[in-house]
Amino acid sequence: MSRDAKSRRQVLTGIVAGAGAALMGIAAWRTAHSQSVREISIVAQRFKFVPNSIELKVGEPVLLLISSLDYIHGFNVPDLGIRADLVPGLVTPIRMTPTQTGRLDFLCDNFCGDSHEEMHGQFNVMA
């Protein structure tokens, strides 16, 4: 093979590789931007979550930003196996994507006083 043929082959290989990388980058960008993540803030304070009733959609990615005002509360969604401690002054991020319709209960699972059992809420997942 002559030098010119090798040079052309190398140039063509570089062009094909560059085009492939560009297409992969575009595909990744489209995927990342086609499903934006909905952010929902939840505040825990003694005996309540605010809000305590939240509507979600099946397949919609959600980022929960949960904080505590007064105590180390727990955040537990038993049906999804989600659990976290909520430390006052910190925001705890939790990602989730509901996969079916229905009601998902959440609750505080760190005892925080006499009305602790009242500290709960729900996600209502719609189609």
Which positions does each model-derived feature cover?
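C-terminal segment of N-terminal export signals and the immediately downstream linker at the start
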Residues: A27-K57
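Solvent-exposed coil/turn segments that connect beta secondary-structure elements
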Residues: Q45-F47, P61, S67-Y71, L80, ...
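Soluble periplasmic/extracytoplasmic beta-strand elements of cell-envelope proteins
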Residues: S41-V43, L63-L65, N76, L107, ...
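Short, solvent-exposed loop/turn elements at domain surfaces
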Residues: F49-N52, I72-N76
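Surface-exposed loop/turn positions
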Residues: S53, V58-E60, L90, G102
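Beta-strand-rich interaction surfaces with strong enrichment in secreted/lumenal proteins
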Residues: N52-I54, G81-D85
